[in-house]
């Protein structure tokens, strides 16, 4: 049998796999177990009561977390004219049309989010095979195809997270860094769950948010008792 690492032994000792923890206790555990040599992210997995095989039960969207994600986000915007100037003023690192598309085709991908105005989709559409697999393709549902590109840039910079359930009906995203205050992580999680509840498909029946687990980049998942979250009230 393979020998457990020191961190794995600590996780096994501290985390009860079948227990749902008070949110404050769960965050305290994550902080105690975050022993990596870099600043770990705090990630969340939300099991939804949906059938992901049915298109009318898939959940996709975006929300701005009140305390951001702790990441510096580089934004590329496809637009022109006055919108281009507005995007630059809002903080976008890359703004353009055909010349920006050429950079991407050449393999220059120095950005984390792509935003486009509707009139630019004729250019962006040709980049689907490059941006799509990386989860970067702009989409109206996530607010990344919009006539108000400046607002979208500000949202991305402010800590907007995009979410989409996977083939198992689970949402995976980040809610901050391990050095965030416990209250900040709690409020970010509550904001995400609130957004998910608003995005509940009409076709989804029964319990919608079935399980919530938080973890650090290198750590094990800790199940959260939803009753200890303000959003549950």
UniProtKB/Swiss-Prot annotation:
It comes from the Bacteria. The keyword ATP-binding does not apply. SUPFAM superfamilies: Ribosomal protein L1. One of its GO terms (cellular component) is cytosolic large ribosomal subunit. Signal peptide: none annotated. InterPro entries: Ribosom_uL1_bac-type, Ribosomal_uL1, Ribosomal_uL1-like, Ribosomal_uL1/biogenesis, Ribosomal_uL1_3-a/b-sand, Ribosomal_uL1_CS. Keywords: Repressor, Ribonucleoprotein, Ribosomal protein, RNA-binding, rRNA-binding, Translation regulation, tRNA-binding. The keyword Zinc-finger does not apply. GO terms for biological process: regulation of translation; translation. Binds directly to 23S rRNA. The L1 stalk is quite mobile in the ribosome, and is involved in E site tRNA release. This is Large ribosomal subunit protein uL1. It comes from Shewanella pealeana (strain ATCC 700345 / ANG-SQ1). The gene is rplA.
């Amino acid at each position: 049998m393979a020998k457990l690492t020191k961190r794995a032994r600590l996780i096994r000792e501290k985390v009860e796999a079948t227990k749902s923890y008070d949110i404050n206790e769960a965050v305290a555990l994550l902080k105690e177990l975050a022993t990596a040599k870099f600043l770990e992210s705090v990630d969340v997995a939300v099991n939804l009561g949906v059938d992901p095989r049915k298109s009318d039960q898939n959940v996709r969207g975006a929300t701005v977390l009140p305390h951001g994600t702790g990441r510096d986000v580089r934004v590329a915007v496809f637009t022109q004219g006055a919108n281009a100037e507005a995007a630059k003023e809002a903080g976008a690192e890359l703004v353009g049309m055909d010349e920006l598309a050429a950079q991407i085709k050449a393999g220059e991908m120095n950005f984390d989010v792509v935003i486009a105005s509707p009139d630019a989709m004729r250019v962006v559409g040709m980049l689907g095979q490059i941006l799509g697999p990386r989860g970067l393709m702009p989409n109206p549902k996530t607010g990344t195809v919009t006539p108000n590109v400046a607002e979208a840039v500000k949202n991305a910079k402010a800590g907007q997270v995009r979410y989409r359930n996977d083939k198992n009906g689970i949402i995976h995203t980040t809610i901050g860094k391990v050095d965030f205050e416990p209250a900040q992580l709690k409020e970010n999680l509550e904001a995400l769950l609130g957004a998910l509840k608003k995005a509940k498909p009409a076709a989804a029946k029964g319990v919608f948010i079935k399980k919530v687990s938080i973890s650090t980049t290198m750590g094990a998942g800790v199940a959260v008792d939803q009753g200890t979250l303000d959003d549950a009230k």
